[in-house]
Amino acid sequence: MADKRDYYEVLGISKSASDDEIKKAYRKLAKQYHPDANPGDQTAEAKFKEASEAYAVLSDPEKKRQFDQFGHAAFEQGGGGAGGFDFNMGDMGDIFGDIFGDIFGGGRRSRASNGPMNGANLRTAIRITFEEAVFGCEKELELSLKDECETCHGSGAKPGSSAETCHKCNGKGQVTFTQQSLFGMVRNVQTCPDCRGTGKIIKEKCPDCYGSGYISRKKKIQVSVPAGIDNGQSIRIRGKGEPGTNGGERGDLLVEVNVSRHPIFQRQDYDIYSTAPMTFTQAALGGDVRISTVDGDVLYEVKPGTQTDTKVRLRGKGVPTLRNKDVRGDHYVTLVVQVPTKLNNEQKDLLKKFEESVSGKKSEDTTTEDTKEKKKKFFGK
């Protein structure tokens, strides 16, 4: 027997690969090398057979156990199929149906499509302010939604006429067809192309809805935005999506919330972050600093000698949680000392006197000595 590659190597997987990983690897190779997708390519056909043989073994728990223990020698006495053993193609029907459906455009086997089907969800977006996201709000949307046509009452047929049973699928909404493959005939089921799964054909269409059974109308919808919602989250409004078919329920409306940036506040989860200014005097002597919060301004008492970039925590001044609006996050504030940019002569003298009292030196003398020293270094004297 000619040398054969390890089955795991053929599929490009490890020995610890799960059943899903084995199936996924085979699916990829089968789609790539299937003879019908590569007509006349003998190399592709050989690789397809090799991958199919590997999958037939590794997808069967008993054969996989034998291969893991004895390798290819476990099947040398099997005779028959490619590679010295006979594998059951019936066990591979599901994956073949999936693969051939992808390659040839056929659908996967599915439940009858002419039963009740819920409508699709609709998506839209709203923009709200930072404060509206924190405390919640009410918004009104105007959307174009489909409603049952009043002329035909949703049948899609012209008044006085009725829909007929589809002859192609006999009212089932699905058609079955077979395809010849390398391994025999493969059975596929797909939605009927004539009636699109409804099982009925409308020959005389309603003049108002043109056979769809629905009319689009502008509607106003109230959106209750809960307190604590964050940017990018969505609100689900049930029953405001696309109408269902064959008695199915309407889909839902998903409203994505976009929160505008705030000039002062930033948010992380349920906590708020900001900065607040304090004067040099407040930092040195202590006192009340005014801090802006989403609830309004509050006074925070700083201790004498508070340094710039000091962080303080205002408990319960953050964002309400979605589960319980009475529970709120915190507000973290970074205190920043504001240095005055314009001083009059009197203010400058006072600061100089303060500096002298701290350093023990006259500010003018210190400046003069510094200036002299710099000049000496510059002129080399």
From Swiss-Prot:
Binding site for Zn(2+) 2: C166, C169, C192, C195
Domain of life of the source: Bacteria
InterPro entries assigned to the protein according to its UniProt record, in alphabetical order: DnaJ, DnaJ_C, DnaJ_domain, DnaJ_domain_CS, HSP40/DnaJ_pept-bd, HSP_DnaJ_Cys-rich_dom, HSP_DnaJ_Cys-rich_dom_sf, J_dom_sf
Cofactor note: Binds 2 Zn(2+) ions per monomer.
Binding site for Zn(2+) 1: C149, C152, C206, C209
Domain J residue range list: 6-71
CXXCXGXG motif-type repeats, residues: 149-156, 166-173, 192-199, 206-213
Region named Disordered: 356-381
Predominant place of localization: cytoplasm
Compartments reported by the entry: Cytoplasm
Oligomeric form and interacting partners: Homodimer.
Reported function: Participates actively in the response to hyperosmotic and heat shock by preventing the aggregation of stress-denatured proteins and by disaggregating proteins, also in an autonomous, DnaK-independent fashion. Unfolded proteins bind initially to DnaJ; upon interaction with the DnaJ-bound protein, DnaK hydrolyzes its bound ATP, resulting in the formation of a stable complex. GrpE releases ADP from DnaK; ATP binding to DnaK triggers the release of the substrate protein, thus completing the reaction cycle.
Family: Belongs to the DnaJ family.
Domain commentary: The J domain is necessary and sufficient to stimulate DnaK ATPase activity. Zinc center 1 plays an important role in the autonomous, DnaK-independent chaperone activity of DnaJ. Zinc center 2 is essential for interaction with DnaK and for DnaJ activity.
UniProt protein name: Chaperone protein DnaJ
Organism expressing this protein natively: Lachnoclostridium phytofermentans (strain ATCC 700394 / DSM 18823 / ISDg)
